[in-house]
Amino acid sequence: MKTTVKWNNVWLLFLSQALFQTASILVITLSGVVGLQMAADKNLATLPIAMITVGTASMMIPASIILKKIGQRKGFMLGTIIGVLSGLVSWYGIIQQSFWIFSVGNMLLGAYQGFTQYYRFAAADAVPDAAKSKAISFVIAAGVIAAFAGPNLAKFTQHLGAVPYAYSYFSIILLSILAFGVVSLLKLQKPINLPTNGTAKKGRPLKEIIKNKDTILALLSSATAFVVMGMAMTTTPIAMHGFGHPSDSPATVIQWHVLGMFLPSFFTGMLIQKFGVYRIIFTGILLLLLYIIIAVTGNGFTNFVTALFIVGLGWNFLFIGGSSLLTKVYRPEEKEKTQAFNDFTVFTAMAISSFFAGSLYNNFGWNGVNLVLLPLLIVTLIVAIRMMKADIKTDY
């Protein structure tokens, strides 16, 4: 495949990621508040957001199988069709004021996300080994566009029409249709038929792959990134509402948070190449610890903006670091099962944490939600330090 075609694919994946992330950030901005208004039991207010991660975790392995069977282009097109259904069901749930239908619509967005999680790996597959971390970073950087588009689309649409928020979720349909058009233009290389003996064809057992220290750190880094980020994003709109901030303030905070998540992606790949993946992961953990300190020391608007921006930075370093590390631990024939296991585990952890976020907030408040994250961060920090001390050199 020619170099121009390879990077054209990366650009198309960047655009389709931007469209999905716009829909995702819109939903993250609004679903906690919508859930709070619609749920009879306020402990379930964050259930719609938790259902996004349930949908993602449930789709990770099926999506991997589908992508391998019908190809990445057709598989990604199928994902956007699920996105259309997500917008339709969520919109209908709001029109009918049905909390459970609305939650199903959010779960379908998670299923769509199950396909989009493979965009970064498709980009890595499309370029030479030396450029993999840059390709991953670039696709994830699409969130910078979504950082502006998502919250502003939420602000613009939430009060349109007779039923608040209905048009916000209807816009997901339009975004998904646009994404369908973009991914239909992909020209991804077909899977290579791998040779001969049974061991080479099947690769190592998954159990053997996940015993690798790099696999453990890659998995732990991504899981920590998503659990901490998910808890922060899920509870921030509700916490700000509880502290008496204006109704449009959470959208601004989420916007800065998403900028923190995705803006560094333009240079994270280069930082990994210069300083090594272990140092980037270590820095990401320190940033998440700093987030907790800022979050629990005040509930003003500045605290929320600063804390959420920093948790975004930490997420970026941990997620891109973990993803880059993961691409080095599997052989080509082991790619699908390793990627699927990684993302299934990550989003299962995020789903569980998001499900309990509302109950944690109602019972222990904003500080309690954040302090409960400390043990996970400490464990990840210890593993990262051990890997750094072992002085394992990997060429990125």
Describe the residue ranges of each PLM region:
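Juxtamembrane intracellular "pre-TM" segments in multi-pass secondary transporters
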Residues: 1-7, 188-219
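Hydrophobic core of transmembrane alpha-helices in multi-pass small-molecule transporters
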Residues: 18, 99-114, 303-317
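Intracellular juxtamembrane helix-capping segments at the cytosolic ends
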Residues: 31, 113-127, 317-330
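Helix-to-loop junctions at the C-terminal end of transmembrane segments
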Residues: 59-72, 264-277, 361
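C-terminal ends and interior cores of transmembrane alpha-helices
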Residues: 81-96, 287-299
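Helix-loop-helix hairpin linking two adjacent transmembrane segments in secondary transporters
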Residues: 96-101, 129, 138-184
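Cytoplasmic helix-loop-helix junction between adjacent transmembrane helices
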Residues: 103-141
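C-terminal membrane-cytosol helix-exit motif in multi-pass small-molecule transporters
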Residues: 173-195, 383-388
